[in-house]
Amino acid sequence: MKQWYEELFENSADNYENEEFTKGTIGEVDFFEKEAGYDKSLKILDIGCGTGRHAIELASRGYRVTGIDLSESQLEKARKNATSRNLDISFFRKDARDFNFNGEFDLAIMICEGAFPLMETDEMNFHILQNAFNSLNDRGKLIFTTLNGLFPLFHSFATFDHLTFRNITTYEMTDDSGNKKVLNCNERYYVPSEITWLLSSIGFKKVTICGCQLGAFSRDEALTSENFEMLVVAEK
């Protein structure tokens, strides 16, 4: 039986590219470039790459990029998008809980909950962070966004479980073929101290957590309870 996040991204690549959160790609890649020191020799891994919006923008700026995603329909769209722009990007169908690149990359990105923190258990989410860590070389860096657990504590979420920090909701959607779906979504929210502990226990030496603004990622943005997402930069 498919999980809700598999159903969410199945046959929905066209709709995905029209979502509001995809409008911030340019500004977000500007931040990645700054974090990469504008070094075009770096190898970058895009985990949960979807239709390739970040990977393609990075490749267009001269970076070597690999994208992985669980959804073949999303990857098919990503490959078409890259081909239309004559860009050489490797896209692979891989589960973020089970991949191994063993120190091949200088930078890994994981944006807009493309993988973490959508999994059924905390252990699965942890495995994603472990795999991201293992994919990086000794001076590697991981940049990702995740759901801010402070937000539902200060806002009214009738569906939020304060014991598990999971928000369980029903979501109605229409796929690219016009088929309607009703999904039972289950997303894990994290507070900053959890993220810091998880990443430190894996082996990251420095963890920076900031507020997250669509298309305007910045280390100068302080995280507050008004931020729906947090931006995390973890360095080996």
Segments from the language model and where they lie:
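Class I SAM-dependent methyltransferase SAM/SAH-binding core
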Residues: 55-98
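A short glycine-rich, Lys/Arg-flanked "PGG" loop and its adjoining helix->strand segment in the class I
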Residues: 124-138
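C-terminal lobe and adjacent flexible extensions of AdoMet/dcAdoMet transferase-like proteins
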Residues: 194, 198-236
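A short acidic, Gly/Pro-enriched loop at the edge of an enzyme's catalytic core
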Residues: 97-107
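SAM-dependent methyltransferase
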Residues: 139, 143-198
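Conserved class I S-adenosyl-L-methionine
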Residues: 1-50
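A short SAM/SAH-binding and catalytic strip from SAM-dependent methyltransferases
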Residues: 106-124
